[in-house]
Design a protein with these regions (language model features):
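Sec-dependent bacterial lipoprotein signal peptides
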Residues: 1-17
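Bacterial Sec signal peptide processing site at the extreme N-terminus
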Residues: 14-34
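Post-signal peptide N-terminal segment of mature Sec-exported envelope proteins
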Residues: 27-48
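Extracytoplasmic
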Residues: 41, 58-60, 91, 108-112
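Conserved, non-catalytic sequence blocks in retroelement Pol enzymes and Pol-derived host proteins
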Residues: 52-53
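Short, well-ordered alpha-helical segments
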Residues: 58-100
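Short acidic, glycine/proline-enriched helix-loop-strand junctions
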Residues: 72-73, 102-131
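Short, cationic low-complexity segments
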Residues: 131-146
């Protein structure tokens, strides 16, 4: 019995120290598997205003993290994860926005982060062009069937 109580106590302590559970999703706006130029996600440029991006670009996807507590350290940690996800998708930068959800504030998780993954036109390779063309053709077919 004593061993079971200690085990339950340890489980409660471990669970209390676990990371924040968030709700994430990714909405593709272009093909997967684009060429990766940024291998160190810490060097991923982060913009908050479109006017700050000084070269032609297109969004390749949007990544959202919902139900975050209003805690700077947790938000910074999630931004690091967003940058890693953007680099893995072939993005050259992200446009990051933060939203406050009054309804979710009652549960203590009012923050949503939304990041557009940006691909610079100058960074598109020939292989990327083929993937973009194929993606566009598939989108036409999908839209024709709806």
């Amino acid at each position: 019995m004593k061993k079971m109580i200690l085990t339950l106590f340890a489980a409660c302590v471990i669970t209390g120290c676990a990371s924040v559970v968030t709700n994430t999703d990714y909405i593709p706006m272009g093909p997967d598997g684009l060429s990766v130029q940024i291998t160190d996600a810490s060097k991923m440029p982060v913009f908050t205003y479109l006017k700050d991006i000084k070269e032609p670009w297109a969004p390749i996807g949007m990544y959202r993290v919902k139900a975050l507590p209003d805690n700077d350290e947790i938000i910074k940690s999630e931004i690091v994860k967003i940058k890693k996800a953007a680099a893995a998708k072939g993005a050259n930068a992200i446009i990051l926005n933060q939203f406050y959800d009054d309804a979710a504030a009652q549960d203590g998780h009012p923050i949503t982060l939304a990041a557009y993954f940006v691909k610079y036109a100058s960074a598109v390779t020939e292989a990327d062009k083929a993937k973009i063309q194929e993606y566009a053709e598939l989108e036409k077919l999908r839209n024709a069937n709806n």
